Amino acid sequence: MNDSLPGAGFWALLNPHTGDLGDVHRTARGFSSDLTAIVECEKGPFFVKAMRNRLGGRRDSLIREARVNPFVVPLAPPLKWQAENDEWIVLGFEAVEARGAKFDVGSPDLRAVVGLLGRIGELPLPGVAEGWAETRWNRFADDAVDAALFEGGALLYSDINPSNFMIGEGRTWAVDWSWPTRGAAFIDPACLVVQLVAAGHSPEDAEAWAGRCPAWVDADPRAIDAFASANLRMYRSFAERRPDAAWLKAMETTARSWAAHRGAAV
């Protein structure tokens, strides 16, 4: 352990679940968490994800992740324990031997990623997710009619990026279910398209990969067009609000490329 890790009170909170501690290795993932780490311990190892116990979206996302976990295992690592006090809220997941996926052109990981995304699309919507309506793209839609195309009864993972797909020996997991929602089933494959274009694929190639997901095949092309337009407006808005964030400008360019490919209104 090192000085950047939480103090003794944090580890005392975890002790009933971990037993005696060994090494603690911070992970590169977890940009929205106060701590993500592999904790070597008497009862582990565990992947530990922790946030300060303050009211708001970040705390709520951890609670949502805990609530959805039983319904997404074995596509996600199982949650083994939870701990909470006035200062911290902590989740302990089964640690898996895996690495982040590679989305670049020619990556051997893409078959596994698309296969897993297809399996996620087949999951039934759990009761806990009934009230988690997907609305993030609604205000960027042309109108209420287009926004209604994003509605649906599918369980959406929505946080599609290479670091959230973990490639193991003969297994692939989707991790960081921080903000699952209920919406139109095509949205997850559409988010994959955006990420693949960002990784260097042409829009045509990216959509060919998405076409391996039944939810994409079954989607109304007009709904996908409306989403591509809204997605571009969303990233354009984000980039305008944070002009120094080069990655947001890059995502705007990516979204523009895909929208242009579809001939979608911008």
Regions from the PLM with identified roles:
Residues 53, 98, 163, 172, ...:
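Activation segment
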